[in-house]
Amino acid sequence: MNNIFVSATNHGFDALAYLDGLPVDRVHQVHLAGHSQGRDLLIDTHDSPVCDEVWALYENAMARLGPVATMIERDGNVPPLKELLRELWIARKLGAHAQQVPQDTRIAEAA
């Protein structure tokens, strides 16, 4: 999700439109991460918390995809366990919404 957000921001395309174009039946895992602000662009560094915009994109993805495996990546600046568990709680909370949306609806919306 962060890669989509970073690329969309840096290259000026719509992240939700990109997400709409993904083949729902081929997505089996979603990765969440943070990024850093470079001089002129965002850098997908996986060394900061997941930002609000990426959480919103993730929530949208879960509504479209349904429950899929989700990994929170933190390759640097690893915070205390309490902060990681907070991100896990957010991911689970947002992902729970996907279980309330019938699969036929998700596929129809993605088509």
What is the role of each PLM region?
Residues 111:
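Glycine-rich phosphate/dinucleotide-binding loop and adjoining beta-alpha-beta core of small-molecule
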Residues 43-49:
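Short, glycine/charged-rich beta-strand-loop motifs at protein surfaces that mediate ligand recognition
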Residues 1-41:
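Acidic/histidine-rich catalytic cores of soluble enzymes
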